[in-house]
C-alpha cells in the first residue's frame, strides 16, 4: 500500500494496482490480515494478506464463471458444497438455481464472513441469515474444509472458492484432497476450483491438473478474464460419472440474469494459450 494506491505483487514482478480513496478497515483475524478499501473506480476492495479477493464493481467476472458452468452442466444440482467463499459471492450465484435444496458453506475464518456481510455487501443479505442460522437453504459451518470433506459426502456439486494455490490453501490442491472430494460427490457429480493465474501460476496450475487426472473420471480446464486479478484466471473441473462438461443447459442459463459468463458461448471458456495446452 502506497499513498492512495493498493498494489498486489505477483511472481516475476507483475503487479495489479488500484487507486483508493481511503482504507475502510484493517483487522487481523486468527488466520490472516483482512483489509477493505474504497477504490476510485471499482467500488470496495477486499484484500486478504495483501492479495485482492474482489472488487465489488467487477466481482461477478469471477463468481459467475466459477459457479455457473458447473451448475448448468449438472443435470440436477440439488445439494451443493462450497469450501471457502466467505465473501458471499459464490453462494449468491448458487442460489440463483431454483433446483438447489441445500448449500453448505465451510469457511475457516468467521471474520471474513462478518466483515464481508457488513462492509462488502455483495451477498444480498445471505451471509447475515446464515450467521444467525435463519437461511432456508444455506447452512454455514465455521471450520476446516479439508477436514469437513474427509467426513462428509452426498454432494452433487463441490465448489472450492479458496485463496491462491500457494501457501495456506496448498492442501486444497493436494491429491489426497481430490480423492476425498471425489468420494464426497454423488454420481454424477462435478468438482470445480479456481486455479490461479494462467501465466503467473503456470506450474501450480499444471500440477493441480495432473493430480486431478489421477483421481477424477474426466478433468477439464478453462479460463476467464477477471477484473482485479492477473488474468486470464484458470479454473479446473473434475467430473464423477458421465457428465459432459463441454455441454451446459444454455436455456436455463439465459434465465439467470448473468452479466459476464454467457452459456450460449460456453465453448469459448476452453481457449488456453497454446504453450499451456502443449504442457498438459
From Swiss-Prot:
It catalyses: S-adenosyl 3-(methylsulfanyl)propylamine + putrescine = S-methyl-5'-thioadenosine + spermidine + H(+). Residues 7-240 form the PABS domain. It is an enzyme of class 2 (transferase). Spermidine binds at residues 63, 87, 161-164. Gene3D superfamilies: Spermidine synthase, tetramerisation domain (2.30.140.10), Vaccinia Virus protein VP39 (3.40.50.150). One of its GO terms (molecular function) is spermidine synthase activity. The active site is at 161 (proton acceptor). Its main location: cytoplasm. GO terms for biological process: spermidine biosynthetic process. It holds the Pfam family Spermine_synt_N. S-methyl-5'-thioadenosine binds at residues 32, 107, 144-145, 168. Disulfide bonds: none annotated. Keywords: Cytoplasm, Polyamine biosynthesis, Spermidine biosynthesis, Transferase. InterPro entries: PABS, PABS_CS, SAM-dependent_MTases_sf, Spermi_synthase, Spermidine_synt_N, Spermidine_synt_N_sf. It is found in: Cytoplasm. Its EC number is 2.5.1.16. The keyword Transmembrane does not apply. GO terms for cellular component: cytoplasm. HAMAP family: Spermidine_synth. Homotetramer. Catalyzes the irreversible transfer of a propylamine group from the amino donor S-adenosylmethioninamine (decarboxy-AdoMet) to putrescine (1,4-diaminobutane) to yield spermidine. Belongs to the spermidine/spermine synthase family. This is Polyamine aminopropyltransferase. It comes from Pyrococcus horikoshii (strain ATCC 700860 / DSM 12428 / JCM 9974 / NBRC 100139 / OT-3).
Amino acid at each position: 500500500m502506497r499513498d492512495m494506491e493498493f498494489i498486489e505483487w505477483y511472481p516475476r514482478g507483475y503487479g495489479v494496482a488500484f487507486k483508493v480513496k481511503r482504507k475502510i478497515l484493517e483487522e487481523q483475524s486468527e488466520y490472516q490480515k483482512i483489509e477493505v478499501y474504497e477504490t476510485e473506480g471499482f467500488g470496495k476492495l477486499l484484500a486478504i494478506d495483501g492479495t485482492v479477493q474482489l472488487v465489488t464493481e467487477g466481482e461477478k467476472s469471477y463468481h459467475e464463471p466459477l459457479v455457473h458452468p458447473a451448475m448448468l452442466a449438472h443435470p440436477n444440482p440439488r445439494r451443493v458444497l462450497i469450501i471457502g467463499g466467505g465473501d458471499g459471492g459464490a453462494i449468491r450465484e448458487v442460489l440463483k438455481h431454483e433446483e438447489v435444496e441445500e448449500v453448505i458453506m465451510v469457511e475457516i475464518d468467521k471474520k471474513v464472513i462478518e466483515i464481508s456481510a457488513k462492509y462488502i455487501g455483495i451477498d444480498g443479505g445471505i451471509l447475515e441469515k446464515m450467521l444467525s442460522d435463519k437461511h432456508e437453504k444455506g447452512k454455514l459451518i465455521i471450520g476446516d474444509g479439508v477436514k469437513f470433506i474427509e467426513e462428509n459426502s452426498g454432494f452433487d456439486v463441490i465448489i472450492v472458492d479458496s485463496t491462491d494455490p500457494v501457501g495456506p490453501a496448498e492442501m486444497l490442491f493436494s491429491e489426497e484432497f481430490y480423492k476425498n472430494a471425489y468420494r464426497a460427490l454423488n454420481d454424477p457429480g462435478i468438482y470445480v476450483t479456481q486455479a490461479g493465474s494462467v501465466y503467473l501460476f503456470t506450474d501450480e496450475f499444471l500440477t493441480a491438473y495432473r493430480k486431478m487426472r489421477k483421481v477424477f473420471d474426466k478433468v477439464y480446464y478453462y479460463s476467464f478474464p477477471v477484473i482485479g486479478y492477473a488474468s486470464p484466471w484458470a479454473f479446473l473441473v473434475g467430473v464423477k460419472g458421465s457428465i459432459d462438461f463441454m455441454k451446459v443447459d444454455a436455456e436455463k442459463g439465459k434465465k439467470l440474469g448473468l452479466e459476464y459468463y454467457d452459456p450460449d458461448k460456453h465453448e469459448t471458456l476452453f481457449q488456453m494459450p497454446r504453450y499451456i495446452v502443449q504442457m498438459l
